[in-house]
Amino acid sequence: MLNHSLARLAAACALTIAPLAHAAGPVIDVYKTATCGCCTAWVDHLKSNGFTVKAHNVADPGVIRAKFGISEQYGSCHTGVIGGYAVEGHVPAASIKKLLKEKPKASGIAVPGMPMGSPGMEGPRKEAYNVLLVAKDGSAKPYTSHAGD
């Protein structure tokens, strides 16, 4: 009787826990400074789009950017790392999902600077901007485009 009850309890736990394990989205490590408000807003954007975010406050996110082959010309204020790729700057979650699905041979993707209207930089106006695919040789080309006002 006790074994039968334990088996039912174990089955119930497995049915309860299994959906929770699948609920967590892809994990992205985000390297940012502790005082950057737009970085925190970008982290919130990722979370609201299904990503599990591990935020790390660092003195110089540029060190992480360089480690993953993203040159300063493509830099912004934070760097994410997911699936072996660097995600530099205010990249929309949809572009990250596309990267993970397509798995191009690249160092990562980047939104140089801090375009108004990009995730984490929301405001009354939106600039047009491109998410760049940064190749292993340091070159870059448009990967996704986002319209402005």
Outline where the language-model segments fall.
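Local sequence-structure signature of Cys/Sec-based thiol-disulfide redox active-site neighborhoods
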Residues: A23-N49
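Conserved helix-turn-beta segment immediately C-terminal to the redox Cys motif
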Residues: V43-V63
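N-terminal signal peptide c-region/cleavage motif recognized by signal peptidases
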Residues: A18-L20
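Stable alpha-helical elements in mature extracytoplasmic
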Residues: T35, W42, N57-D60, P92-I96
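Bacterial N-terminal signal peptides that target proteins for export
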Residues: M1-A10
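Short active-site oxyanion
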Residues: V27-I28, F51-V53, G83-A86
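Thiol/selenol-based redox catalytic cores and closely related redox-interacting motifs
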Residues: K67-D149
